[in-house]
Amino acid sequence: MEEAASQSLEEDFEGQATHTGPKGVINDWRKFKLESEDGDSIPPSKKEILRQMSSPQSRDDSKERMSRKMSIQEYELIHQDKEDESCLRKYRRQCMQDMHQKLSFGPRYGFVYELETGEQFLETIEKEQKVTTIVVNIYEDGVRGCDALNSSLACLAVEYPMVKFCKIKASNTGAGDRFSTDVLPTLLVYKGGELISNFISVAEQFAEEFFAVDVESFLNEYGLLPEREIHDLEQTNMEDEDIE
C-alpha cells in the first residue's frame, strides 16, 4: 500500500510539473475550456481530443501519438486554438494602446515645424506647455550636416510625437551674426521656457553620413528624449511569441 501511495504521489507530482512552463499554461487553458464548456454542446470526438491534449503524457504515450497521423478533427481543433491565441494577442495590444492614450498627457505633434521669424521662435519657446520638450535646429541651406539633421529630426518627430521638433534658418532668427556657418547646425533644447541643452556644430558629433538613429542615440545620451511609446507594444509582442 505504501509503495502504491508513493507511486501515486510521484505521478501526481509529475503531472503537475508538466504544467509549469508556457506550454503547460496553454494545456491548462485547454483543460479549462473543456471543463467550462457545456458538455452536451461538445461532440464526444472533440471532447476526447481536448482531453488528450490537456493531459500529461508518458514518454511511451508520446511516441505512440507521434507515430500516428493527425486526424482532421485534431487539425481543426489546433487551428481553432491558434485563432483564440491570436485574438488574445490582439486584445492585449489594444489594451496597451488604450493605456498609452490615457497616459500620454499634453499635446502631440508628429512633424517638424518651420519657424519663419525670431518672434515666432520666441513665441514657440515661451508659450508651449511646460511639460513639452522642444528641439530646435538652427541651420542654413548648403551648410554641411544641416540637411541631414533636418531629415533625421523629421523621422524622430514621427517616433516621438510628444516632442516638438522645430527648425529655423539662422538668417531668420534676428541674431544671424551669432550663428555663423562655423557653428551650424546648432541644436537647442528647451523645456518650460528654459534652455536645457545646446549643441554647437552638432554635425561634428557624427560621421560624414548620419541618420535618425544616430541623432536619437546622441539625444538619449543626454536624457533629452522620452521613452518611445512603441516600446511596450513591441515587448508585448515578444512575450506573445514566447508563448507560442
Curated annotation (Swiss-Prot):
Recorded source organism is Mus musculus (Mouse)
Q: Where is this region: Disordered?
A: 1-68
**What are the Basic and acidic residues biased-composition ranges?**
58-67
Q: Which GO terms describe its cellular component?
A: cytosol; nucleus; photoreceptor inner segment; photoreceptor outer segment
- The reply on keyword Manganese is no
Q: Which gene encodes it?
A: Pdc
Family classification: Belongs to the phosducin family.
Write the protein's name: Phosducin
Matching InterPro entries? Phosducin, Phosducin-like_reg, Phosducin_N_dom_sf, Phosducin_thioredoxin-like_dom, Thioredoxin-like_sf
Name positions with the PTM Phosphoserine: 71
- Pfam family example for this protein? Phosducin
Q: List each copy of the Phosducin domain by range.
A: 1-244
Give me the ranges of the annotated region Thioredoxin fold.
109-244
| Alphabetically ordered keywords of this record | Cell projection, Cilium, Cytoplasm, Nucleus, Phosphoprotein, Sensory transduction, Vision
The task this protein performs is described as: Inhibits the transcriptional activation activity of the cone-rod homeobox CRX. May participate in the regulation of visual phototransduction or in the integration of photoreceptor metabolism.
> Post-translation: what modifications?
Light-induced changes in cyclic nucleotide levels modulate the phosphorylation of this protein by cAMP kinase.
Supply one GO BP term.
Answer: regulation of G protein-coupled receptor signaling pathway
